[in-house]
């Protein structure tokens, strides 16, 4: 009887640990400034772009992509004042992936990722989606949390579901 309970317990644990959260919504095309995520999902297409491409041809990027993702390797340059208007005038959501300082260093003039005060900006979030609507004089931000690095698939799924809904 103990052996049966042990075997059933092990099967239950194995079944739970293999639970992978995978985005299965509409196909999304995401422009990436920085490192392309290592994500294997046929519904998500990543394409590398530069900050200059994004700033010089915002209309083309907004028309051909569902979102722009900026990754940590580009945060310092991406937080330069010359890009603030680009983010605030973008017609598509911007994902600041793995930014503990949220979107503020990128959307506020006179502030860079390096100089932004971490203690005052850290709300515990891992990633922020930012969307500004100049015509409506409105900006929205959605925060995503990652408590366990093993749950990165779940984080991506939530981010992509939000992008799909916008």
Task: Mark where each language-model region is.
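Conserved beta-strand segments of the P-loop GTPase G domain that flank and frequently precede/overlap
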Residues: 32-33, 68-72, 95-98
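A short, well-structured beta->alpha microelement
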Residues: 33-63
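Short, well-ordered secondary-structure micro-motifs within conserved domains or adaptor modules
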Residues: 61-75
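Positively charged n-region of N-terminal signal peptides that target proteins for export
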Residues: 1-4
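C-terminal motif of bacterial Sec signal peptides marking the signal peptidase cleavage site
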Residues: 12-15
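Bacterial signal peptide processing site
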Residues: 17-20
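Extracytoplasmic electrostatic interaction patches
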Residues: 36-37, 82-166
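Active-site-adjacent loop/helix micro-motif of nuclease/hydrolase catalytic cores
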Residues: 42-43, 75-84
């Amino acid at each position: 009887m103990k052996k049966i309970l042990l075997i059933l317990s092990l099967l239950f644990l194995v079944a739970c640990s293999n639970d992978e959260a995978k985005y299965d919504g509409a196909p999304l095309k995401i422009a990436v400034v920085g490192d392309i995520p290592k994500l294997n999902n046929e519904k998500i297409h990543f394409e590398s772009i530069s900050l200059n491409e994004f700033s010089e041809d915002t209309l083309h990027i907004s028309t051909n992509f569902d979102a722009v993702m900026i990754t940590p390797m580009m945060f310092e340059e991406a937080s330069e004042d010359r890009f603030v208007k680009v983010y605030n005038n973008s017609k598509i959501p911007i994902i600041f992936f793995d930014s503990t300082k949220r979107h503020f260093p990128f959307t506020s003039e006179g502030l860079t990722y390096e100089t932004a005060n971490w203690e005052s900006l850290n709300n515990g979030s891992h990633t922020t989606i930012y969307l500004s609507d100049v015509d409506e004089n409105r900006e929205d931000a959605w925060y995503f949390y990652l408590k366990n690095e093993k749950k990165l698939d779940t984080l991506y799924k939530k981010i992509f579901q939000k992008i799909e809904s916008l």
